[in-house]
Structures are given as C-alpha cells and as structure tokens.
Design a protein with these regions (language model features):
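Short, well-structured alpha-helical segments
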Residues: 230-245, 327
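Transmembrane-helix signature of 12-pass secondary carriers
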Residues: 1-221, 249-351
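Surface-exposed helix-capping loop/turn segments at secondary-structure junctions
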Residues: 227-231, 251
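TPR/TPR-like (Sel1-like) alpha-helical repeat modules
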Residues: 221-227
C-alpha cells in the first residue's frame, strides 16, 4: 500500500506541473528586465520603479483571485477540471505577454495578470489533488514534491533567461526572441498539463463527497492497484465516506438556519466556511497560525529577491545584465540543492 505505482507517478508528475509553473513565473520577469531589447522596447516600464513594481505585483493580484476561487471551483467542477482552467489561464497569459508591442506595454500587464490567475488556481488545487490521490502514509512526502517542482521552475527560469539573453547578441542587435522565449516556454508545461489532465483520474475524495461512491471506489482501486474488495481499499474508502458524512452533519449543526437547498449548495458551503474560520477561537487560532507562517515567510523578502535578483546583483557591482543573470542562475542552483537535500532527508526518514 505504501508504494507508488506507475499510474500514480504519472498523475503526481502531471499534477506537480502546476508547482513548476508557479516557480517558473517567479523567476522569468527579472531576467527580462535587464535584457537590452526589453529595455529598448519598454523604457516606460524599466525606467519607472512604480511601473516595474506594478508589472511584478499584478501577477500577485491575479494570484489572489485564482487562489480564492480555486476552492469553490475545485468543489463544484472537480480538482481535475479546475486545474485544466488554470492551464488555460497560464497559456493565455503567456501569449498575451509576448504579444506586447514596441512602446506599448499594456499586454505585458494583461499577460501577467492572467498568468497570476492561473498559478493562483494551481496553488490552491494542485497540492490538494496530489494529497487526495496519494497513499495516506506517503501523503506528506508527496505534497512536498509540489514545492520541489516550484524550485525546479525557479532555477530553470533563471538559466533559460541567461541562455536566451544571447539570442542576437547582448547589445543593440539583440532579438526580441531573447525576452519572449522564456515566456513562450512558460506556456509549454501548462499546455502539456492541459492535454495530460484528461488521462488523470478524478480525486476519489471528491467523487465520494459528490455521492459517486461506485466511481470513487473504482478510482481508489485503480490508484492503489488492489481489488475493490481488498481490506486496505475498503478501509480507505470508508474513512473518506465517514469524513464526508461528518462534514455534512457538522455543517448542518453549525448553520441550522440554512434551508436544505442552501445546505446542499457548494457555493453557500464554501462561503460559510470562510465565516466558520473566525466564528470560533479554536478555528481562528489554527488558521492564524498557518497564515502567519506564510506571512512571515513572504515578509522575509524571499519573493522580492527571486523577482528582482538580476537588479539586486547589478546594484552590488555586477555590471551588465549578463553577469547579473549568471549570478542569479547560481542562486537558483542554491535553491535547488537546499530543497533536494530536505526532500532526500524526508524520503530517508520515511524509508
């Protein structure tokens, strides 16, 4: 039961592409900002700290929208189809971005916003999908690979940007493809995921919560490569079913004034859950703890370093975009080595 079969490996790999996209888009903009052709095409963006800040942060605004709505859409349309919609947003955003014309950066902002919606949706539903299809005893380790995929995305965006900087030379003859290619590549994993997702199973937990017990049991049997009547499959199936029943009864108890129709509405349930977060001190304390951990992680400035690494290296004396981009690539390798070290320790601990 504790091993991962090839079908699960494929599902988890495809599901983790969302993490790759999240990491890749974090690193791809900073590389463009120091490229000669990008600076010549969009001086109003590069020469204005405010415009550069907006181009960076508008992706986060899209991410807020995507992450907030991913829970609702994931419950209504399934985790699988919600990830498909995220792919579409990322592909749309990527190709709007490269469609920006000389001295007209509006498409840059539109592309970054829609990409943000996509990666925000991925962040909400991708790890959830991986957790729900993974064997219970491997769930924590499997979900951590989403972060591993994120780090790979960051590192590759740094090195792809460094390599593409040489297309047409690093001077005035530099090709537009130098800053466009990294963003074109950004859309490739999303397109692969959009195709591959049709071969992924639905989350068994989602199926059972929707009352599709027979499909949920078949999916569990398929994922675990065990017969439907095997005791381990039956135990996991009954645990999920009991949890779904508990959630329904708990919701009815906490919101007795809602009608039966309102209680069966996924949208009403999801909105009510946000209220439930602050309704009791215990819930608020748990959510606040998780929220503050992520808040202070961001407060450390790590994302700002990732977004503006080339400019930071230029400011400390690495003149010329090429040297700064090389130093940024080395930073990506440090991220990767640090992450894989922790992942290997987690794997060895489990084994």
């Amino acid at each position: 039961m504790g091993r991962i079969c090839y079908d699960q490996e494929f599902s988890l790999m495809i599901g983790s592409l969302g993490g790759f996209e999240y990491g890749y888009q974090q690193g791809v903009l900073g590389q463009s900002l120091v490229m000669t052709r990008f600076k010549d095409n969009f001086p109003s963006v590069v020469e204005s700290a405010s415009a550069t800040g907006w181009l960076t942060s508008i992706l986060q605004l899209g991410g807020i929208l995507g992450s907030i709505t991913s829970g609702v859409f994931g419950e209504i349309f399934s985790r699988k189809y919600t990830m498909f919609s995220a792919c579409c947003w990322v592909v749309l955003g990527s190709y709007l971005y490269i469609g920006a014309s000389y001295h007209n950066p509006a498409m840059l902002y539109a592309g970054r916003f829609f990409t943000g919606v996509g990666v925000g949706t991925f962040s909400g539903v991708g790890p959830l999908y991986n957790a729900e299809i993974a064997p219970p005893e491997l769930r924590g380790m499997i979900v951590s690979f989403y972060q591993f995929a994120t780090i790979i995305g960051i590192m590759l965006s740094f090195w792809i940007g460094y390599a593409s900087n040489y297309i047409g030379g690093i001077g005035e003859g530099q090709s537009n493809l130098a800053w466009q290619l990294p963003t074109i590549i950004q859309g490739v994993p999303a397109a692969i995921l959009a195709i591959g997702i049709w071969w992924l199973p639905f989350s068994p937990r989602w199926l059972i919560k929707k009352g599709r017990d027979e499909e949920g049991l078949k999916t569990l049997s398929y994922l675990r490569k065990l017969p439907q009547d095997h005791e381990l499959v039956q135990v996991e199936f009954l645990e999920i079913k009991a949890e779904a029943l508990f959630e329904r009864r708990s919701f009815a108890k906490n919101f007795p004034n809602l009608s039966a129709k309102e209680q069966s509405s996924v949208l009403v349930k999801e909105v009510a859950q946000y209220y439930q977060i602050v309704r009791t001190w215990d819930n608020f304390k748990r959510v606040s703890t998780a929220w503050l951990v992520m808040f202070f992680q961001q407060w450390s400035g790590i994302d700002a370093i990732i977004y503006f690494a080339p400019q930071i290296f230029e400011s400390v004396g690495l003149t010329g975009g090429t040297q700064a981009m090389l130093a940024t690539g080395v930073t990506g390798v440090v991220f990767f080595v640090s992450t894989i070290r922790k992942c290997c320790k987690s794997l060895c601990h489990h084994l």
